[in-house]
């Protein structure tokens, strides 16, 4: 889990655009964040299996 201070630090407007980075809105993870959903791949997988993300289902071919 991310420290609360890192979440607050990331939420502030940065002076330079390259300092901005995405964090998972659910767990605060800074890596592998899907911008479209605003959550990391781990939370995305969990929510998709639970059916909490509408229109998402497991692929099979």
Swiss-Prot record:
Name this protein carries in UniProt: Small ribosomal subunit protein uS14
Signal sequence interval, chain numbering: none
Similarity section: Belongs to the universal ribosomal protein uS14 family. Zinc-binding uS14 subfamily.
Keywords: Metal-binding, Ribonucleoprotein, Ribosomal protein, RNA-binding, rRNA-binding, Zinc
Cofactor note (record): Binds 1 zinc ion per subunit.
Residues binding Zn(2+), per UniProt: 24, 27, 40, 43
Coiled coil: none
Transmembrane segments: none
Source superkingdom: Bacteria
SUPFAM superfamilies, per database record: Glucocorticoid receptor-like (DNA-binding domain)
A GO CC term assigned to this protein in UniProt: small ribosomal subunit
One Pfam family linked to the record: Ribosomal_S14
Record HAMAP family: Ribosomal_uS14_2_B (MF_01364_B)
Role played: Binds 16S rRNA, required for the assembly of 30S particles and may also be responsible for determining the conformation of the 16S rRNA at the A site.
InterPro entries: Ribosomal_uS14, Ribosomal_uS14_bact, Ribosomal_uS14_CS, Ribosomal_uS14_sf
Subunit structure: Part of the 30S ribosomal subunit. Contacts proteins S3 and S10.
GO biological process, one term: translation
Any one GO molecular function term: zinc ion binding
Cofactor section: Zn(2+)
